[in-house]
Amino acid sequence: TVRKRIQQLESEGVIKGYSAHIDYQRSGYPLRMMLFCTASIPERGDLVSDILAIDGVVSVQELVTGEQNLLVTAVGESDSDITPVAQELLDMGLTIADEVLVRSHEATPFGEFKTD
């Protein structure tokens, strides 16, 4: 059954938890900005929790290829909400190589998990 399969994936650590799928546009935070950053490689992993603690940051991804090795996503009501995020990243010693304004974001779960 589906329930047993989910329980199996949870016990194997494949499913680590559940989160809400938030429509930031409808919640009053229409601006979504991706900031491509560079951190020193020894510090990169240690910085993730500090970056997530910055007000407005909703995700951090470690990148393993290219010069930019952290992708920070922040949301806000306006540009003035994103500027403090960028400043805090700079204060942490990160370099911001690029900023990208996101118009929309859609996702789907990976559908290739095999059943026994």
What are the language-model segments listed below?
Residues 1-116:
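A compositional/biophysical signature of low hydrophobicity enriched in polar/charged and small residues
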